[in-house]
């Protein structure tokens, strides 16, 4: 039924070498596949096996989605066999109208790869229409004077069928006067005419009736009949004559309706009524009669409607001129319509990909489309283009067919979709154009790894946090879509190994929130680092890592711990012995405490809560040093007790207490007989209550206090100045031991810690100083020489040298040298007031020495001075010895039983006397005994 390029391709031996390349070049190398079918085929009739003619197997029909497309779809493809089937009624006369060659053009589309083939179906005419006369009754007139051979034109019948199925012949019934002649024009049209065979006699027969039959060439033939009535009239011997037998004119299709088109003219040599000519359309299609109008008197032809070259290119009509005597003649009028560029091109999308992967290579076909312009010639030639700033371009695959292909890399994250506007422009003057926009969606692939908001994270978490609390949150973003952009978080590494990371922290896979699995302890874990990973769910998965450093902040959760004084092995408290001759400022002992916290939470301060003799001792706020605030008086007990509180700097502060037992004696033998008779000291809480009662009583006797004050003022005026000086409030005692001038200074080789039971019945008697101390702060002496000074001013110091007691400065053997000072470098002067350490190194040095001092004080193994119970520091606890876990404390180093501070032992080994503070040092000539 039809030929195909595929069949010819298989026939060529050389083309077999390139079976895979032929589908790409098929549209340009082969002629269209042609089929020929008769019209009016039933629906479902097989036109041909399109798959076979394309060289496709039965499996390829569905796999490659073989289909056809056209403006009016009259055909379809069987999805199983690949047959081209009739889908709708095919009427050649309706589809092609008056065209003799009727063809339907289709496009066969296949995918994988995407391609298109041209198919032409020729519609063959069948004899489905019978001839038809415009008028069933034909009336003619003829003069009786008409000679034999006169011809009368008859209206021909019409048949929409073509070729052999069109009108083939005409017949009339037999009669003696007329015969039928068929005239064939140059275009093949057949026109019947009656020929007069013999003269007429109107008087004999005034009219003649004939039957005209039109036959087509079909098998079987179809026919139509018309009744002819001929009236015989009087003589009119000259018929009209046209100036031309054929009129031809060309008109623009843009000619407005009502415009004059053509005027036909005919002349008649007769006179009178026989010369009056009227014009009529004859043998003209009804569509032509609707398009044009003819003035019967003038012969002027005008258009009733606008022309459209795309619908009808040429009009043909016959005009008859008839005179008043009934004679007539005909002429042919041909009107050709000239094409104007009045139709814009059309863009028809035949195939379009729904989505394009963003990793599609350049040259991938994403759409097929064709153009159509109903104009003719250059007006119908179309060229297409698109925007130049998009990664696509157009290829012309064949006449009026185009491919839209990729021309660069696609990135969905930057441009998720493209609105491609195709512009088609014809070559007319002026050119006309049209556009068609299509939307191309870019499908996502997993080409972007997650990205964290920060390059690293640092969070601060206070210790003792509740387990399960969130401590941080990391966030990452992924511009991909769906699973490619869905992020999960996890912990992949940490510096807690080999500890179980999961027992410390966890992370929410969905939100990135980091939770603490336990309460952190700053003293055990101050900081740790985690490596978090963000991973998407694409295939393959992509990930990114980020570091998270967690700093555990300190809280005041550890109370101070007193290292000295400590209880003995039997639970009894140690006693510190104080010489009876101790002057104000004498260093009695030192409270040493540590705090496991850090920072301000470990900044310790020392306070006296209770004292058996208030005002006798002073306590350094930061150093914890216990010094004599005044000289021992006659009424002061030999045994003294101090209750000291150690507070840290936290909020709220935590504290610890320590009890100091002090004994005034010059040697141990002096106090041993009386220790058993010493009454037991009252309970600290009871004494505190007692003082509260006394304070309340004092408030009630304010008047009595006023009297006492008046008596005191009177006594001041009556007593000698020397006696009053003991009560002078301006007395300042030099810090450090006061030694009478008949003694020489030197280092003590021994010191004592005396433990005395509470059942003693005796106590040491010391000389009490009547000078009260008006400050409970640390005593700092700057000018006092350690003796009673009259209140007359500094000039008495030079005028009465015999009243001054010379006192050597403290022995520097017990002081730190500059190189041995803990903390900062030796060139920097330390702060003697207990200020906070400047750096971690200072803290570690002090912590090491404090622990060493405390350890030796506890076990009585002091090596400094050689005496048992001395909390001295040996050379191994110098500044180079560090302990990382001991908290920071400065100045809390004390040597019990001594009024000296640490010194460099090197000077002692070299036999050099330490330099005194004021140059009045005497060499010791005596050796102290225990």
UniProtKB/Swiss-Prot annotation:
Main localisation: membrane
Protein source organism: Pan troglodytes
Biased composition (Polar residues): 800-839
Regions crossing the membrane: 692-712
One Gene Ontology CC term in the entry: plasma membrane
Entry keywords, A to Z: Calcium, Cell adhesion, Cell membrane, Glycoprotein, Membrane, Repeat, Signal, Transmembrane, Transmembrane helix
Keyword Transferase appears in the UniProt entry: no
Glycosylation sites per record: 304, 419, 545
Stretches of the chain found on the membrane's Cytoplasmic side: 713-930
Leader sequence segment: 1-30
Classification via CDD domains: Cadherin_repeat (cd11304)
Pfam families: Cadherin, Cadherin_2, Cadherin_C_2, Cadherin_tail
Biological process, per Gene Ontology: homophilic cell adhesion via plasma membrane adhesion molecules; nervous system development
PROSITE patterns: CADHERIN_1 (PS00232), CADHERIN_2 (PS50268)
Taxonomic placement: Eukaryota, Metazoa, Chordata, Craniata, Vertebrata
Function description: Potential calcium-dependent cell-adhesion protein. May be involved in the establishment and maintenance of specific neuronal connections in the brain.
Listed SMART domains: CA
Sequence ranges assigned to domain Cadherin in this UniProt record: 31-133, 134-242, 243-347, 348-452, 453-562, 570-675
Disulfide linkage: none
Membrane side Extracellular: residue ranges: 31-691
Superkingdom in the source lineage: Eukaryota
GO molecular function: calcium ion binding
Membrane topology: Single-pass type I membrane protein
Residue ranges, annotated region (Disordered): 791-839, 900-930
Biased composition (Basic residues): 920-930
Annotated localization: Cell membrane
Protein name: Protocadherin gamma-B6
């Amino acid at each position: 039924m039809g030929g195909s390029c595929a069949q010819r391709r298989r026939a060529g031996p050389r083309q077999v070498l390139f079976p895979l390349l032929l589908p790409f070049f098929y549209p340009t190398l082969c002629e269209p596949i042609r089929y020929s079918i008769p019209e009016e085929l039933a629906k479902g009739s097989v036109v041909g096996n399109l798959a076979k003619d394309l060289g496709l197997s039965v499996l390829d029909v569905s796999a490659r989605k073989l289909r056809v497309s056209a403006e009016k779809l009259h055909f379809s493809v069987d999805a199983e066999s690949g047959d081209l089937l009739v889908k709708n009624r095919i009427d050649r006369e309706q589809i092609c109208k008056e065209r003799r060659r009727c063809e339907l053009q289709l496009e066969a589309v296949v995918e994988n790869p995407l391609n298109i083939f041209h198919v032409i179906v020729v519609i063959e005419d069948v004899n489905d229409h019978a001839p038809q006369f415009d008028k069933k009754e034909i009336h003619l007139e003829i003069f009786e004077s008409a000679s034999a051979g006169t011809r009368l034109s008859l209206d021909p019948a019409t048949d929409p069928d073509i070729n052999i199925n069109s009108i083939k012949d005409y017949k009339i019934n037999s009669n003696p006067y007329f015969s039928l002649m068929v005239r064939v024009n140059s275009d093949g049209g057949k026109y019947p005419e009656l020929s007069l065979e013999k003269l007429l006699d109107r008087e004999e027969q005034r009219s003649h009736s004939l039957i005209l039959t039109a036959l087509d060439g079909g098998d079987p033939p179809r026919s139509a009949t018309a009744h002819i009535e001929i009236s015989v009239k009087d003589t009119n011997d000259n018929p009209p004559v046209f100036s031309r037998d054929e009129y031809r004119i060309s008109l623009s299709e843009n000619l407005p309706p009502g415009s004059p088109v053509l005027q036909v003219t005919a002349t008649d040599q007769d006179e009178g009524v026989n010369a009056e000519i009227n014009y009529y359309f004859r043998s003209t299609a009804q569509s032509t009669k609707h398009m044009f109008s003819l003035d019967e008197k003038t012969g002027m032809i005008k258009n009733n409607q606008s022309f459209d070259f795309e619908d009808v290119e040429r009009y043909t009509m016959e005009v008859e001129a008839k005179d008043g005597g009934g004679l007539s003649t005909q002429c042919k009028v041909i009107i050709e319509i000239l094409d104007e560029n009045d139709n814009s091109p059309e863009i028809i999308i035949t195939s379009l990909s729904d989505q394009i992967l963003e990793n599609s290579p350049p040259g991938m076909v994403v759409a097929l489309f064709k153009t159509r312009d109903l104009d003719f010639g250059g007006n119908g030639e179309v060229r297409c283009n698109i925007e130049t700033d998009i990664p696509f371009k157009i290829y012309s695959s064949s006449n009026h067919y185009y491919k839209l292909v990729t021309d660069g890399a696609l990135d969905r994250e930057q441009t998720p979709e493209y609105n491609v506007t195709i512009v088609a422009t014809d070559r007319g003057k002026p050119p006309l154009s049209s556009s068609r926009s299509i939307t191309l969606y870019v499908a996502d692939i997993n080409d972007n790894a997650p990205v964290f908001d920060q390059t690293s994270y640092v969070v601060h978490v206070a210790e003792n946090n509740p387990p399960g609390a969130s401590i941080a949150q990391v966030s990452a973003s992924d511009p991909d879509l769906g699973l490619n952009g869905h992020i999960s978080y996890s912990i992949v590494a940490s510096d807690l190994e080999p500890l179980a990371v999961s027992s410390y922290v966890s992370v929410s896979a969905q939100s990135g929130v980091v939770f603490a699995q336990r309460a952190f302890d700053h003293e055990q874990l101050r900081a740790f680092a985690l490596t978090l990973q963000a991973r998407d769910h694409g295939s393959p998965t992509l990930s990114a890592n980020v570091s998270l450093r967690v700093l555990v902040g300190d809280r005041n959760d550890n109370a101070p711990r007193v290292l000295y004084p400590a209880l003995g092995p039997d639970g009894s408290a140690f006693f510190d012995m104080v010489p009876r001759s101790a002057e104000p400022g004498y260093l009695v002992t030192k409270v040493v405490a540590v705090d496991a916290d850090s920072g301000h939470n470990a900044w310790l301060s020392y306070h006296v809560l209770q004292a058996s003799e208030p005002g006798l001792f002073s306590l350094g706020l930061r150093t914890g040093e216990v010094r004599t605030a005044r000289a021992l008086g006659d009424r002061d007990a030999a045994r003294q007790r101090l209750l000291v509180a150690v507070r840290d700097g936290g909020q709220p502060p935590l504290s610890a207490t320590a009890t100091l037992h002090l004994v005034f004696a010059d040697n141990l033998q002096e106090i041993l007989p009386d220790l058993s008779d010493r009454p037991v000291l009252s309970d600290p809480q009871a004494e505190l209550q007692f003082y509260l009662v006394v304070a309340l009583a004092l408030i009630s006797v304010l008047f009595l206090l006023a009297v006492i004050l008046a008596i005191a003022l009177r006594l001041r005026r009556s007593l000698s100045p020397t006696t009053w000086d003991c009560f002078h409030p301006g007395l300042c005692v030099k810090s450090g031991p006061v030694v009478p001038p008949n003694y020489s200074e030197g280092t003590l080789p021994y010191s004592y810690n005396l433990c005395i039971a509470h059942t003693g019945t005796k106590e040491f008697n010391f000389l009490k100083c009547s000078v009260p101390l008006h400050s409970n702060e640390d005593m700092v002496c700057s000018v006092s020489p350690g003796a009673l000074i009259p209140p007359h001013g500094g000039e008495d110091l030079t005028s009465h040298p015999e009243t001054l007691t010379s006192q050597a400065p403290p022995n520097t053997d017990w002081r730190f040298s500059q190189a041995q000072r803990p903390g900062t470098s030796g060139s920097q002067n330390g702060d003697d007031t207990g200020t906070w350490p400047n750096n971690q190194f200072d803290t570690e040095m002090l912590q090491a020495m404090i622990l060493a001092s405390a350890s030796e004080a506890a076990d009585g193994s002091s090596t400094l001075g050689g005496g048992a119970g001395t909390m001295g520091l040996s050379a191994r606890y110098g500044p180079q010895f560090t302990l990382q876990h001991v908290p920071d404390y400065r100045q809390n180093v004390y040597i019990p039983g001594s009024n000296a501070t640490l010194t460099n032992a090197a000077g002692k080994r070299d036999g050099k006397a330490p330099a005194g503070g004021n140059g009045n040092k005497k060499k010791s000539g005596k050796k102290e005994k225990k």
